[in-house]
Amino acid sequence: MFYKEENFKKTEIGEIPEDWEIVELKDVCKKIKAGGTPKTSVEEYYKNGTIPFVKIEDITNSNKYLTNTKIKITEEGLNNSNAWIVPKNSVLFAMYGSIGETAINKIEVATNQAILGIIPKDNILESEFLYYILAKNKNYYSKLGMQTTQKNLNAQIVKSFKIPLPPLEEQKQIAKILTKIDEGIEIIEKSINKLERIKKGLMHKLLTKGIGHSRFKKSEIGEIPEDWEVFEIKDIFEVKTGTTPSTKKSEYWENGEINWITPLDLSRLNEKIYIGSSERKVTKIALEKCNLNLIPKGSIIISTRAPVGYVAVLTVESTFNQGCKGLFQKNNDSVNTEFYAYYLKFKKNLLENLSGGSTFKELSKSMLENFKIPLPPLEEQKQIAKILSSVDKSIELKKQKKEKLQRMKKKIMELLLTGKVRVKT
């Protein structure tokens, strides 16, 4: 099915197979045109509209195929603006904002002025192939847009894009192969989304109702099982604040081996519950001279400056900056830190709402210390943490599989869309 190409020619866009052509987009498309936005102040242009109206967020929120839009316009709105009907199976291309975002519309649509509708010529250029060519070069188009005065692309620039043009049948085969990979990625994404919904439901049920309870009582944090108690964080955890050693002193940072965790490190975990490394590390000298709080593994780190509420459990002893607080348990016999990490993640919105500050939100040490939390029996804490951790592991495995497929797709795109590897037709 595949073979390695041996015969290449040099072109403006690099080496391509001898039997491929280089063409400008305008020469292989029937139409390349931006849309327009009907006046939002005119109700008749939008009320009970039936024409899907594409904005950039519709493209960024879709995968390869666009099948729906958030907003719809009326015929009157269409006729009183620069919007036009883009036939289905055309290519939509963003010129502003998220430059280079691309989709194929599976329904007839109108677009706003930030989006080009591109209709390829029949029997010359396949929409599916064009989609992948544009997607492959997205970063280049984005940089190109940033070089213009307006920091955007325009229709004239896009019309002059030079693209490789393999024989039509080969275009179809290339698109078919890449579509199969995209379908695999989409299946995994759906599975991840399903698991995340399951986890959300489990967190709500387990962290408020526990496991196997039939008797409940009212409390300051809502209805909880009868044998659960309510305490403030300071009753169960020692709360420590973080700091930043002087960045002007290299002895505090150079060849540092001690984790120095920031809210950014926590935000990069996504849904993971554990953290074992940080982007920047400090030295033992910094630890001694700057009175940094070093807290043991198994402790909780929570971001308390914008963004508030990112939480993780340490897998190694670490220190942290002033955007975080460290919580380590006072009594190991009654606390499972994984349970409380999940509980604090579950209460992220409430913690954000408690945060004060006009410039940026911050959860003070006293606010966190006084925050009320439940205390279930230790074995139940462990069971709840184990269930949620198991779902997290499943999600993480799916994400790793998705990332592997995405890496594979990128390599295959590079080989097929440059003609280094050919598809037999």
Swiss-Prot record:
Checking InterPro entries in the record gives: Restrct_endonuc_typeI_TRD, Restrct_endonuc_typeI_TRD_sf, Type-I_RS_S_subunit
Fetch the Pfam families from UniProt: Methylase_S (PF01420)
Region of interest (Target recognition domain 1), residue spans: 9-168
Family the entry assigns: Belongs to the type-I restriction system S methylase family.
SUPFAM superfamilies in the record, alphabetically?
DNA methylase specificity domain
PANTHER family documented for this protein: TYPE I RESTRICTION ENZYME MJAVIII SPECIFICITY SUBUNIT (PTHR30408:SF12), TYPE-1 RESTRICTION ENZYME ECOKI SPECIFICITY PROTEIN (PTHR30408)
Which parts of this chain are annotated as the region Distal conserved region (DCR)? 369-418
**What is the protein's known function?**
The specificity (S) subunit of a type I restriction enzyme; this subunit dictates DNA sequence specificity. In the presence of the R subunit the complex can also act as an endonuclease, binding to the same target sequence but cutting the DNA some distance from this site. Whether the DNA is cut or modified depends on the methylation state of the target sequence. When the target site is unmodified, the DNA is cut.
Q: How does it assemble?
A: The type I restriction/modification system is composed of three polypeptides R, M and S.
Protein name listed in UniProt:
Type I restriction enzyme MjaVII specificity subunit
**Keywords annotated in UniProt:** Coiled coil, DNA-binding, Restriction system
Q: Which organism is it from?
A: Methanocaldococcus jannaschii (strain ATCC 43067 / DSM 2661 / JAL-1 / JCM 10045 / NBRC 100440) (Methanococcus jannaschii)
Read off the domain note.
Contains two target DNA recognition domains (TDR), each specifying recognition of one of the two defined components of the target sequence. The TDRs show high structural similarity and each forms a globular structure. The two TDRs are separated by 2 long, conserved antiparallel helices that form a coiled coil structure. These conserved regions may act as a molecular ruler for the separation between the two recognized DNA sequences.
